[in-house]
Amino acid sequence: VPESARKLAAACWPGPLTMIFEKTNAVPLETTGGLTSVAVRYPSNKVANALILAGGGFIAAPSANTSGRPSPTKAEHVIEDLGDKIDCIIDGGDAEIGLESTIVDFTEEIPTILRPGYYNKEMLEKVLGTVRVDPGILAEDSHVRPKAPGMRYKHYAPKADLTIIQGEMERVIPEINRLAAEQEKAGKKVGVICTDETREQYTTGDIKSIGLRAEDETIAHHLFAILRDFDEDGVEVIYSEA
């Protein structure tokens, strides 16, 4: 384990950070999908940590969701995805953060972000200095494949078509109202994602506030839960403030 990874662990663990290292012979290939590297995470949830300690300090397990759906943030979401495929669920309460962990690859000379998450590039650079972002994440060319499997295909997406409207709010709000009204007139069920400050200015659709605009952690906490609520309600088109 490189010293840079130890510094990052001291700053960010326990928390939503996954680090990738070259595995040793102590790590079975069955737990890495045959790869020579292994992803390690130390969660902040007390129930998860109690389970890990009960298991001897290490647990190898996949994520509690099916590919292509918004990430689960509560036990009910796991039941929806995996209810008939698993024997039990240990409910540790709602996810505190609500976003995926940031994945950082330490098998390269320069630490590389393979999946964006709660910890962004600027946060990591304060600890590590230089940090790269996997070119496959940024590439508009679909032939450039991200290194992390979870970034290669459609993941974390709602069933509805989602459009994010950017710009000054005095233009964004009427534009979303116009688009939502058009879709409703066409027979579509519409959802709108906004912030507390603008909630009362929307007139059409299933309107959900994601929190105060300046509170990034609140917005992160609510994002996937709102997308799943829209799925459950049969929403077909979603418009969101940026």
Segments (PLM) and residue ranges:
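Active-site-adjacent structural elements in enzyme catalytic cores
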Residues: 1-242
